[in-house]
């Protein structure tokens, strides 16, 4: 009864349990301040709970558009970025999608779930994309998916390499989920390249992983097409109210981003050659230390495949010092 393709899938798993430090999901270490929560509750008081939310999430789209200086028609909002990825893999003409492993696995997941083949163009040794090879593979592709900063390696992709792919005219989805921590983005290319889709989220820099709100910035043509196939009413009234409120307080989040970046660099210096440079809110660490850390109540992300023997570590606050102390112990055990 169940499709063979579904039987072949491995469900997305995370570690659960009574651990003391969680550095595995790239969440913000900062909750919303009490006064912002109160503002959200006030916003919700005027919203009827017995009615469906706006069918295309227009209140949130307008707030995001105003924040970036874009019309709401250039914005799509989803129940997390994953929902939008699920539509984007199906939206464009072509024989397959192109991905650049090691990278975020949900591009391939949703493509294969929908019977769409996946062509992989691996990252170079320095984890940058090979724009020439991707452009060649893109000729028959429906879309190319590039994460910048890349998850799990943490690096921004060179603009000149992304441009090589954009010049093909094929749909290019650049996942900028962590871009606020990088200080550089591709927003300025939207007018020049109508085939560009920027995918972003409120889960990281805006401390809203629990609200599940992702969004896409793209040409009006792409956004209109996306809403032709998108489930109606998918972004609830709570999520839309939260978006409107947090975007009224950009200064708070800019300061938090600066603090996370400062901590990232401090932790990276402490780890020395074990840590790769990062433009995100996490570090890729060359250390087979997952089990060692777990035994000490510290949860990090264990990596596999090309990154076997590596871990991905979210930048926290005071948790960072406990992690660094445990890593010093691990280095002693490992003889480093």
Swiss-Prot record:
Keyword entries, A-Z: Amino-acid biosynthesis, Aminotransferase, Histidine biosynthesis, Pyridoxal phosphate, Transferase
GO annotation, biological process: L-histidine biosynthetic process
Cofactor(s) this protein cannot do without: pyridoxal 5'-phosphate
PROSITE patterns: AA_TRANSFER_CLASS_2 (PS00599)
Catalytic activity, reaction form: L-histidinol phosphate + 2-oxoglutarate = 3-(imidazol-4-yl)-2-oxopropyl phosphate + L-glutamate
Gene Ontology MF: a single term: histidinol-phosphate transaminase activity
Residue positions, PTM N6-(pyridoxal phosphate)lysine: 204
EC number: 2.6.1.9
Gene3D superfamilies in alphabetical order: Aspartate Aminotransferase, domain 1, Type I PLP-dependent aspartate aminotransferase-like (Major domain)
Pathway: Amino-acid biosynthesis; L-histidine biosynthesis; L-histidine from 5-phospho-alpha-D-ribose 1-diphosphate: step 7/9
UniProt xrefs under Pfam families: Aminotran_1_2
Family affiliation: Belongs to the class-II pyridoxal-phosphate-dependent aminotransferase family. Histidinol-phosphate aminotransferase subfamily.
Stored NCBIfam families: hisC (TIGR01141)
The protein's name in its UniProt record: Histidinol-phosphate aminotransferase
Organism this protein belongs to: Thermococcus kodakarensis (strain ATCC BAA-918 / JCM 12380 / KOD1)
């Amino acid at each position: 009864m169940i499709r063979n393709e579904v039987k072949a899938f491995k469900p997305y798993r995370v570690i659960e349990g009574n651990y003391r430090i969680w550095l595995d999901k790239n969440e913000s270490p900062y909750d919303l301040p009490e006064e912002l929560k109160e503002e959200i509750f006030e916003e919700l008081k005027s919203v009827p709970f017995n009615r469906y939310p706006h069918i295309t999430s227009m209140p949130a789209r307008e707030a995001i558009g105003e924040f970036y200086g874009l019309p709401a028609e250039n914005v799509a909002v989803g129940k997390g970025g994953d929902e939008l990825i699920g539509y984007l893999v199906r939206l464009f003409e072509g024989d397959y999608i192109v991905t650049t492993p090691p990278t975020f696995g949900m591009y391939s997941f949703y493509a294969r779930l929908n019977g769409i083949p996946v062509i992989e163009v691996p990252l170079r040794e320095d984890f940058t994309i090979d724009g020439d090879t991707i452009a060649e593979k893109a000729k028959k592709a429906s879309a190319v998916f590039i994460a910048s900063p890349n998850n799990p390696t943490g690096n921004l992709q060179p603009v000149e390499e992304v441009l090589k792919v954009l010049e093909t005219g094929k749909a290019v989805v650049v996942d900028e989920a962590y871009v606020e921590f990088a200080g550089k983005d591709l927003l300025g290319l939207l007018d020049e390249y109508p085939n560009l889709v920027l995918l972003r989220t409120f889960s990281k820099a805006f401390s809203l992983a629990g609200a599940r709100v992702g969004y896409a910035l793209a040409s009006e043509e792409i956004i209109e097409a996306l809403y032709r196939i998108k489930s109606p009413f998918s972004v609830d009234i709570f999520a839309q109210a939260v978006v409107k409120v947090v975007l009224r307080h950009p200064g708070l989040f800019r300061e938090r981003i600066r603090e996370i970046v400062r901590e990232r660099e401090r932790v990276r210096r402490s780890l020395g050659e074990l840590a790769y440079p990062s433009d995100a809110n996490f570090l890729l660490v060359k250390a087979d230390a997952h089990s060692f850390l777990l035994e000490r109540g510290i949860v990090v992300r264990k990596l596999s495949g090309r990154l076997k023997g590596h871990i991905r570590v979210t930048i926290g606050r005071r948790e960072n010092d406990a992690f660094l102390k445990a890593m010093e112990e691990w280095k002693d055990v490992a003889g480093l």
